[in-house]
Amino acid sequence: MRLLLLNGPNLNLLGQREPGFYGAMTLKAIEADLLAQAEAEAVQLECFQSNFEGALVDQIHQAIGQVQGILINAGAYTHTSIALRDALLGAAIPYVELHLSNTHAREGFRHHSYLADRAVGVVSGFGALSYRLALEGLLAHLRQPQQVL
């Protein structure tokens, strides 16, 4: 099984940007942890980060027929990007939306997601652990899609 992890804008600054919201782990450390978890599950995981919306859309398009699921932390694009929503819907690949911080405990403009209503699930507020929980949930869905979790 192959999965894609997408990280959006400013996530390359993890570990130095607002650690009170996002924690002290770098994106590289989070990815290394998730790659180890994926390997233990016999899953191939590709990681990609971009600050550019179009690059994320391109990755989703390239994933069609190549991956069975997507983990996406779209960062601020979660609240603004109809293009990412359309790409995910067009690709028809199951995805889990994830966030380090609890977006509903933050500014009002972060309460709306253009991605959540079509996601398999949403994980937020657990810091770096959100990535592990999202992977676990996506794998459970892909391995037993008919079972209500």
Curated annotation (Swiss-Prot):
What Pfam families does its record include? DHquinase_II (PF01220)
Q: Which GO terms describe its biological process?
A: amino acid biosynthetic process; aromatic amino acid family biosynthetic process; chorismate biosynthetic process; quinate catabolic process
Q: Which residues form the active site?
A: 22 (proton acceptor), 99 (proton donor)
Provide the residue positions that the database annotates as binding substrate.
Answer: 73, 79, 86, 100-101, 110
Its biological function?
Catalyzes a trans-dehydration via an enolate intermediate.
PANTHER family, sorted: CATABOLIC 3-DEHYDROQUINASE (PTHR21272:SF3)
Q: Which NCBIfam families match?
A: aroQ, PRK05395.1-1, PRK05395.1-2, PRK05395.1-3, PRK05395.1-4
Instruction: Specify the protein name.
Output: 3-dehydroquinate dehydratase
Which organism does this sequence originate in?
Prochlorococcus marinus (strain MIT 9313)
Tell me what gene encodes this. Answer: aroQ
